[in-house]
């Protein structure tokens, strides 16, 4: 119990160091509401409680909850040893696609870099965006679709978009893809166990990477999170790892 309390104090001191020292060193302002929010979130994460926090626009809540999550994992590991709890990923659910991308490509890389440089963490923070299979390419169906249009007078931009899926398995990354092509090449609701492409399937590889224990932060929209909850209630296979 003594060590747990000491680790908790140390975790809260690190919050102050991050927001009052490290962030200002990189040109960011000190925001008291942001710091208070991070302390509140960390307390509830470590206490395994539910917290409803009303955070106004512009206080920097994204960094507040990211820092709280990183320190939660670090100090739950130190305080509890190798319990399953600290190995669970954190799920961040947001309705904004732009924010999902920003968390993955801007917030997390910046936070990971400065915390590693400071010695707060020893390894990069790994994250992935999770979404439904209808957003991804089925390699077998893509191959069939490309063969089907070879002799057809297809719109040049749409054809180029379709062919580019050989390089991009996430269809949201490709412009000018027709709705029909998207439906024809997306991962089906049920994948065949004897699919000839299963061993090299990019969608299956994406799922494997997403389930890796080092993939700490799972980013999704609200519908995906609710769908995961529904799967669990119906005793279906969850969409997300236990979090």
For each feature predicted by the language model, list its residue ranges.
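Contiguous, well-ordered alpha-helical segments that form the cores/surfaces of helical PPI scaffolds
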Residues: 39-40, 63-71
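N-terminal pre-P-loop "Q-motif" helix
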Residues: 28-45
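Walker A/P-loop
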Residues: 47-67
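SF2 helicase catalytic motif II
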Residues: 239-243
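A substrate-engagement module of RecA-like helicase motors
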Residues: 2-20, 29, 76-218, 222-226
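DNA-processing P-loop NTPase/helicase core
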Residues: 229, 234-236
């Amino acid at each position: 119990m003594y060590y747990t309390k000491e680790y908790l104090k140390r975790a809260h001191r690190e919050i102050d160091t991050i927001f009052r020292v490290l962030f200002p060193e990189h040109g960011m302002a000190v925001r008291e509401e942001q710091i208070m929010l991070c302390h509140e979130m960390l307390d509830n994460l470590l206490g395994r409680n539910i917290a409803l926090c009303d955070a106004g626009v512009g206080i920097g809540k994204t960094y507040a909850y990211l820092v709280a999550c990183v320190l939660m994992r670090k100090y739950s590991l130190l305080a509890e040893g190798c319990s399953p709890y600290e190995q669970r990923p954190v799920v961040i659910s947001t309705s904004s696609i732009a924010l999902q991308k920003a968390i993955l490509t801007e917030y997390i890389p910046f936070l990971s870099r400065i915390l590693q440089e400071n010695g707060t963490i020893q390894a990069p923070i790994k994250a992935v965006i999770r979404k439904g299979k209808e957003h991804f390419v089925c390699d077998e169906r893509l191959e069939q679709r490309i063969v089907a249009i070879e002799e057809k007078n297809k719109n040049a931009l749409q054809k180029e978009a379709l062919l580019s899926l050989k390089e991009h398995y996430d269809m949201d990354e490709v412009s000018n893809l027709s709705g029909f092509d998207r439906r024809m090449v997306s991962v089906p609701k049920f994948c065949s166990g004897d699919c000839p492409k299963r061993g090299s399937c990019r969608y299956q590889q994406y799922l494997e990477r997403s389930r890796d224990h080092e993939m700490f932060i799972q980013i999704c929209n609200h519908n995906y999170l609710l769908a995961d909850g529904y799967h669990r209630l119906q005793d279906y296979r969850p969409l997300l790892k236990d979090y």
